[in-house]
């Protein structure tokens, strides 16, 4: 299983050319081996918020995009273990709560996070692919 950061899920749906070769390879391998590709439930919130504020332009209504995501991805819930770990990440980790929850999800699940976010990758708190 792999976990996609919010922007990676959006790019995969809307503009796959923005993905790195390594990210595409990891996603293709997961699909070929019938492994789960997951996103955090907070990514849905982030996407809905971005669409509502006009910061991302979707080809389809956000509800339809979420229907596509439900078919394509495993949506990972925010559990008490994830919430606790997100709150306990070191202060050197980026402070954005959504980033912390997404990284903690990868850590609790024991899976790599596909992200272009250099702050998360530099923190080395979780295994990342980019």
Residue ranges with predicted function:
Residues 1-39, 53-67, 109, 119, ...:
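Short, well-structured N-terminal submotif of metal-dependent ribonuclease cores
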Residues 8, 43, 82, 102, ...:
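Alpha-helix capping/helix-boundary segments
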Residues 10-12, 48-50, 84-87:
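A short acidic, helix-capping loop that chelates divalent metal ions and anchors anionic groups
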Residues 76, 128-130:
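Short acidic-hydrophobic, aromatic-tinged amphipathic segments that line or gate anion-handling sites
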């Amino acid at each position: 299983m792999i976990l996609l950061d919010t922007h990676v899920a959006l790019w995969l749906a809307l503009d796959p050319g923005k993905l790195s070769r390594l990210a595409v390879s990891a996603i293709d391998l997961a699909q070929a081996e019938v492994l789960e590709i997951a996103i955090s439930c907070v990514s849905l919130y982030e996407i809905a918020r971005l669409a509502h504020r006009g910061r991302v332009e979707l080809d389809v209504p956000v509800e339809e995009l979420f229907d596509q995501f439900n078919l394509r991805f495993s949506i990972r819930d925010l559990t008490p273990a994830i919430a606790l770990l997100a709150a306990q990440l070191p202060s050197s980790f980026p402070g954005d709560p959504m980033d912390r929850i997404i990284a903690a999800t990868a850590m609790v699940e024991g899976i790599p996070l596909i992200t272009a976010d250099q702050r998360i990758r530099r923190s080395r708190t979780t295994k990342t692919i980019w």
